[in-house]
């Protein structure tokens, strides 16, 4: 039986930010999930309901993506602003990201971050909203993206390190190394947003004893927006595998350093030095520089497709990283009709499949084989209408899976 009992969304009373029930009716849950689909015409369609690339064209903000490297990158304004507020005000809030906000207030926030010319960059009126409204806004943006953050062409490759190593803890270091390679196959803007979200959610996982939101619970909430594919939408086993991947990325947010960033980590000046000489302000980061890094709890004997969570709140260790700034690079692999086979030169370096780990090189060599990946065209994108239809089907499946009759022991 899958451990899905925390996926159901508790209710919220629209008129009272302070009085939240811990359980949500299926009618209210469906209303919240379908809000964007039903009301998308109220907004200009430049921030919500478009691709990440299109959204960044009108509303992006620079942030420090990873504490361990002080990598600076651009993410959507709505994610940067809501993430910053939640980090400062909601780390100890019970059920954060699980409890739904008020549809009315979330729509108001959505309108703010959809309105030109600043698209919410100057917004400071958080006092009229509560943390559940703001967390729901962040989720709504992710759920409205026209494609998951891991492109469909990389879906199988991105899951492979976990699927090949069912006993995750025994192969933890190798899995981390594989993801350091695989991250570099992502488009730069997708990589930056996933890294930021993993670091942000890592903070909430660290406070699981207070907010009751483990890395497993958080991964289940964001997984459909980060790592999903139409061919696996209605398969519980595949859903669980993808959730486990996202959980691993959250738990190891400070350990996984994409390879180009690692290569430049020891040669570039500290972010503060860059700010001093370039007269810039170092932007908000997901994890403050004075906070300790969270190292994942023990995950011994975790086996797929079993649903046992990776996290164990009774086993924590802490370590520290030195902070460096480094250059930014685009995704080194181009997409063409024959697969991921065209190396891209960047900053004087070329990253080819052969320069990656042997396992990843083998995967790249087979990515064009539809029998291996299930993808006929590696550049395929799910049409927006089909994506929304699949999203509704997935939510219907989740409601059935998390119904009281399915979740009771």
Curated annotation (Swiss-Prot):
Stretch forming the signal peptide: none
Compositionally biased spans, kind Polar residues: 1-26
GO cellular component: cell cortex
GO MF terms held by the record: GTPase activator activity
GO BP terms in the entry: negative regulation of Rho protein signal transduction; regulation of fungal-type cell wall organization; signal transduction
Keyword Chaperone in annotation: no
Renumbered residue ranges of the record's region Disordered: 1-32, 362-409
Compositional bias ranges of the Basic and acidic residues kind: 377-386
Subunit structure: Interacts with RHO1.
Full protein name: Rho-GTPase-activating protein BAG7
UniProt source species: Saccharomyces cerevisiae (strain ATCC 204508 / S288c) (Baker's yeast)
The organism's taxonomic lineage, starting at the top: Eukaryota, Fungi, Dikarya, Ascomycota, Saccharomycotina
Gene, per the UniProt record: BAG7
């Amino acid at each position: 039986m899958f451990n899905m009992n925390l996926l159901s969304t508790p209710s919220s009373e629209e008129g009272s930010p302070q009085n939240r029930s811990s359980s949500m009716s299926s009618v209210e849950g469906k209303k919240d999930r379908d809000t964007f689909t039903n009301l998308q015409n109220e907004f200009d369609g430049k921030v919500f309901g478009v691709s990440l690339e299109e959204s960044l064209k009108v509303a992006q903000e620079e942030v420090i993506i990873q504490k361990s490297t002080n990598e600076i990158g651009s993410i959507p304004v709505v994610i940067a602003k809501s993430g910053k507020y939640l980090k400062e005000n909601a780390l100890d809030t019970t059920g954060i990201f699980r409890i739904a906000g008020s549809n009315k207030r979330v729509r108001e926030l959505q309108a703010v971050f959809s309105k030109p010319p600043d698209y919410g960059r100057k917004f400071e009126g958080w006092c009229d909203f509560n943390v559940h409204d703001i967390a729901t806004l962040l989720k709504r943006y992710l759920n409205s993206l026209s494609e998951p953050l891991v492109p469909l062409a990389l879906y199988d490759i991105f899951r492979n390190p976990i699927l090949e190593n069912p006993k995750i803890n025994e192969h933890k270091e190798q899995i981390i190394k594989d993801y350091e390679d695989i991250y570099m196959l992502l488009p730069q803007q997708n990589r930056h947003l996933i890294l930021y979200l993993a670091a942000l959610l890592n903070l909430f996982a660290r406070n699981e004893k207070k907010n009751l939101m483990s890395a497993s619970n958080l991964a289940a909430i964001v997984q459909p927006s980060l790592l999903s594919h139409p061919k696996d939408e209605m398969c519980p086993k595949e859903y669980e595998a993808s959730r486990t991947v996202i959980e691993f990325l959250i738990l190891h947010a400070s350990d996984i350093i994409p390879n180009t960033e690692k290569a430049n980590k020891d040669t570039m000046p500290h972010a503060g030095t860059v700010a001093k000489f370039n007269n810039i302000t170092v932007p908000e980061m997901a994890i403050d520089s004075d906070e300790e890094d969270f190292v994942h709890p023990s995950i011994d004997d975790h086996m797929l497709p079993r649903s046992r969570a990776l996290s164990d709140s009774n086993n924590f260790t802490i370590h520290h990283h030195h902070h460096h700034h480094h250059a930014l690079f685009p995704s080194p692999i181009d997409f063409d009709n024959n697969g991921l086979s065209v190396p891209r030169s960047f900053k004087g370096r070329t990253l080819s499949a052969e320069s990656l780990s042997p396992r990843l090189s083998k995967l790249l060599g087979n990515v064009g084989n539809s029998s291996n990946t299930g993808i006929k065209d590696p550049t395929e994108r799910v049409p927006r209408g089909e994506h929304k239809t699949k999203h509704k089907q997935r939510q219907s499946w989740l409601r059935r899976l998390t119904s009281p009759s399915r979740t009771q022991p």
